[in-house]
Amino acid sequence: LLKDTFIEMYKNKPVNKISVKEICSTAGLSRGTFYIYYENIYTLLEEIEEDLLLDLKSLVKIDTLIVYTEKDIPVFVKTIKNLIEYIKLHSTYFKALLGKNGDALFMYKIKRIIKNNLLIKFRAENRQFGDLDEYLLEYIASANIGIMIYWLETDMKISPEKLMDLVLKILFMGPFSIR
């Protein structure tokens, strides 16, 4: 209840403008209850972010992201599908955390998860890691996060299936293959 109440407020105003008193009043709880669980607003925010990041890490296991042959593609597709469904299920949280009042560090942490998994994939393929590969990793991570943020900002007006198809086409065929 505290998390949901906080997130609803966070969608509309920055964290430094939200008070414990306001959260508790809206949630119908005492401030004492809040302080049993959290030291302050920032520890509440940190717990929300860490819970989501742990879930994302478990969904994006590296073995599900490596596509060696065509037989590996269904597992990869399932991983992308699960990620999109997870984001949709927790869209209220992701909208707030990645929205205009959101925490840039949260986006950076998501990027880092993506980039680390891609780096492991590159190494598993015995790919030589050159200077420009850092830019490639940054591009892929930023593009994927950007698509998800846009999907959330537009109230998920396309279905998760269409979004998944779009992401897969861009990843496998390039952005200019989309018509």
Predicted regions and their residues:
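Short, hydrophobic secondary-structure boundary micro-motifs
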Residues: 18-19, 95-97, 160
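Basic, amphipathic alpha-helical hairpins
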Residues: 8-15, 90-91, 124, 174
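Short secondary-structure transition hinges
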Residues: 69, 74, 88-118
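Amphipathic alpha-helical packing segments from all-alpha helical-bundle domains
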Residues: 101-126, 134-138, 142, 176
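Alpha-helical structural segments
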Residues: 1-8, 26, 43-63, 78, ...
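Helix-turn-helix
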Residues: 9-42
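C-terminal peripheral helix-coil segments that are non-catalytic and often amphipathic
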Residues: 134, 141-142, 146-179
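Hydrophobic alpha-helical connector segments
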Residues: 61-89
